[in-house]
Amino acid sequence: MITKTGTTIVGMKYKTGVILAADTRSTQGPVVSDKNCVKIHQITDKIMCCGAGTAADASRVARMASRELRLFQNKYLRLPLVSHFRKVCTQHLHKYGGGIGAALIVGGIDSEGCHLYEIHPHGSENSALFVSLGSGSLGAIATLESRYRAMDKDEAIDLACDAVKAGILNDLYSGSNIDVCVIDYSGVEFLRNYRRIGVSENTDTLVYPLDSVRIKREEVFDIVEEY
């Protein structure tokens, strides 16, 4: 059975960079196949992407585009732009007319500034201040639209996590933990399992007093025959 990431992935710009966040659940039909998979992929030193849809398709497209950008960098001795990654992915996906189940959120920083794009499986793309894709994107985008504003790094991380959490709590195919990636001019910071969702807050074991169940009557049955 095909493994799908189900997924709630989020991307947003903040004052000095870009935040990407994703849940960590992948499914095979109604079964959770992996509770802690990685949906955030590194493309170059300052370009990252999140993948939703079919797990194999999303990771293969990201790896293919990463190879293209690294070949460009080695050939021309120039750092590739985020728009270069966007172009490689959209042209590749458009050739297959939506047959490749990969929806991507791309974030990065280059010589032209901070960039955030959403790329759909049929090859269309859009630039945005914030975006969410995947089966849990409805809850996530509602959180982003109601609370997004000019923010610093810590505020942006909290909002991105809350958006993914909203997707997780309203989507059976999203769950487990939240991974966060911060991209700014100093580099990339990947925060693995930054927040756990759905874990019981009360971890104390229940202890019952010995006299909590009182014996009101005692009766002995002789069921062994004596010879």
From Swiss-Prot:
Recorded hits in SUPFAM superfamilies, A to Z, give: N-terminal nucleophile aminohydrolases (Ntn hydrolases) (SSF56235)
GO biological process assignments: proteolysis involved in protein catabolic process
Pfam families registered for this protein in UniProt: Proteasome
What's the Enzyme Commission number for this chain? 3.4.25.1
Which cysteine pairs make disulfide bonds? Answer: none
> GO terms for molecular function, please?
threonine-type endopeptidase activity
Keywords of the record, alphabetical order, are: Cytoplasm, Hydrolase, Nucleus, Protease, Proteasome, Threonine protease
Write out the catalysed reaction. Cleavage of peptide bonds with very broad specificity
Gene3D superfamilies with a match to the protein in the record: Glutamine Phosphoribosylpyrophosphate, subunit 1, domain 1
Gene Ontology, cellular component aspect: cytoplasm; nucleus; proteasome core complex, beta-subunit complex
Which superkingdom does the taxonomy of this entry point to?
Answer: Eukaryota
Propeptide residues according to the Swiss-Prot or TrEMBL record = 1-6
Active site annotated at which positions?
Answer: T7 (nucleophile)
Q: Please indicate if the UniProt record lists Protease as a keyword.
A: yes
Going by the record, the broad EC class of this enzyme is hydrolase
Instruction: Quote the function comment for this protein.
Output: The proteasome degrades poly-ubiquitinated proteins in the cytoplasm and in the nucleus. It is essential for the regulated turnover of proteins and for the removal of misfolded proteins. The proteasome is a multicatalytic proteinase complex that is characterized by its ability to cleave peptides with Arg, Phe, Tyr, Leu, and Glu adjacent to the leaving group at neutral or slightly basic pH. It has an ATP-dependent proteolytic activity.
Subunit composition and interactions: The 26S proteasome consists of a 20S proteasome core and two 19S regulatory subunits. The 20S proteasome core is composed of 28 subunits that are arranged in four stacked rings, resulting in a barrel-shaped structure. The two end rings are each formed by seven alpha subunits, and the two central rings are each formed by seven beta subunits. The catalytic chamber with the active sites is on the inside of the barrel.
Protein's name in the database: Probable proteasome subunit beta type-2
Q: What organism, scientifically named, is this protein from?
A: Encephalitozoon cuniculi (strain GB-M1)
